[in-house]
Regions:
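Secreted/extracellular ectodomain signature
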Residues: 1-131
Length: 131
């Protein structure tokens, strides 16, 4: 038996993003302690797209009060090291001026993560919206 979920992150608020991602990681650890394997996929689009970028320089998020990406990147790396998959929306990247070579290691790019979301749900993944 495994716990399969697609976590649909759209929030651009760094505090909320990190808090919710920490809860996702906690959930995976909880399942592991119960002897249940987790198969988690994290989708990043809308405001959450920025957290999949290595740097915000030159993007639509490049502002004087831009978020510090380090805490989010640390959590994303931890999520990936546990076997989680990170998928960044190509359409959102284009709209945010985030180049493909500016995406964090371990993440993949899907042109339209709505397609990924529907496909995963049709394969039995629980849909978990995080806005």
């Amino acid at each position: 038996m495994s716990a399969r979920a697609v976590w649909d992150f759209t929030t651009g608020d760094a505090r909320r993003f990190c808090d919710r991602l920490a809860l996702v990681i906690d959930s995976a650890e909880d399942f592991r302690q119960r002897g249940i394997e987790s198969d988690f996929v994290l989708l990043l689009h809308s405001g959450a797209t920025q957290f999949g970028a290595r740097t915000l320089r030159g993007t639509k998020f490049d502002k004087p009060d831009a978020v510090d990406l380090a805490p989010a990147h640390e959590l994303l790396q931890r999520f990936a090291s546990m076997g989680g998959r990170i998928v960044v929306c190509g359409i959102a990247m284009e709209r945010s001026a985030i180049a493909e070579d500016n995406v964090i290691d371990g993440a993949t790019i899907e042109r339209n993560v709505f397609v990924s979301s529907v496909a995963l749900q049709n394969r039995g993944y629980a849909y978990m919206p995080i806005s």
